A protein has these predicted regions:
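Helix-loop "lid/cap" segments that line or gate small-molecule binding pockets
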Residues: 102-114, 155-162, 210
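A generic short alpha-helical patch detector that favors 3-5-residue windows
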Residues: 17, 21, 93, 97, ...
Length: 244
């Protein structure tokens, strides 16, 4: 983030000022795939994509490898990568499975109760989310910061569940298209993008409220609803072939 972004930040809460190098390339490419910029099977040219995004070829190549792990692109041997063909049913099924698994994690944590250390970690994590939305608009770097915050929240929840099998099952499921909690299908309109991400943050707050109240059913239900919210983006399904 540049100097101007740091000086505009409100002192409380502190705004995120570090993002992973090249992460914005992954997010941008994921959005292009979700919006149907590449037809299924179409080769994604590294040079053309790098020029479109205003970066060198290396971060594009790194991003494509990451998106291959997410099931969004497939390797074409020495020819690079192509957008993977997928159906709405495939995406819905993968997201539903994630909701079930993360819902189980939330339920287990609500049943056991948070330790003081766990509660502190979740408080610190949610504070990162609050900082992102404090100004009511998304500034440069905020989408990247949300990506990190969102991934941290989901990882904390699954780890705190105390069941390693949940994490293993989620890791396997994450190789399916748009199944990962990190596979954000973002809006191109800034106002819609803010609303979409802010809604996801409020879901996190709701889940944690249920966990702190030891309400197992509500915690599980809230986490499932949160996962299915990804299906609400029309752009996510614009390029998908309907499953009849």
């Amino acid at each position: 983030m540049d100097t101007a972004d740091r000086t505009e930040a409100k002192p409380a809460p502190k705004r995120p000022d570090r993002v992973k190098p090249g992460q914005h390339v992954i997010i941008s490419l994921r959005r292009m795939i979700a919006q149907g910029r590449f037809a299924p099977g179409e080769r994604i040219g590294e040079i053309a994509t790098a020029e479109t995004l205003g970066v060198s070829r290396m971060p594009v190549r790194t991003a494509l490898r990451a998106l291959e792990a997410e099931g969004l692109v497939e390797k074409l041997g020495a020819r690079g990568y192509a957008a993977r063909s997928m159906t709405s049913a495939e995406v819905e099924g993968a997201i539903e499975v994630r909701g079930v698994l993360e819902g189980l994690a939330a339920r287990r944590l609500a049943a056991r109760g948070l330790s003081a250390a766990e509660d502190m970690r979740f408080c610190e994590c949610l504070a990162r989310g609050e900082a992102i939305f404090a100004r009511g608009t998304l500034a440069q770097g905020d989408v990247d910061a949300f990506h990190d915050y969102n991934r941290a929240f989901h990882a904390l929840l699954v780890a705190a569940s105390g069941n390693p099998s949940i994490a293993e099952a989620i890791a396997r499921n994450d190789h399916l298209p748009f199944a990962s909690s990190s596979a954000l299908a973002l809006e191109s309109d800034p106002a819609s993008e803010f609303a979409h991400l802010h809604s996801a943050h409020r879901d996190h707050v709701d889940v944690m409220d249920a966990i702190r109240r030891r309400d197992e059913e509500r915690a599980e239900r809230a986490m499932r609803v949160h996962a299915r919210a990804a299906l609400g983006s029309e752009r996510l399904f614009r390029r998908l072939v309907p499953q009849g």
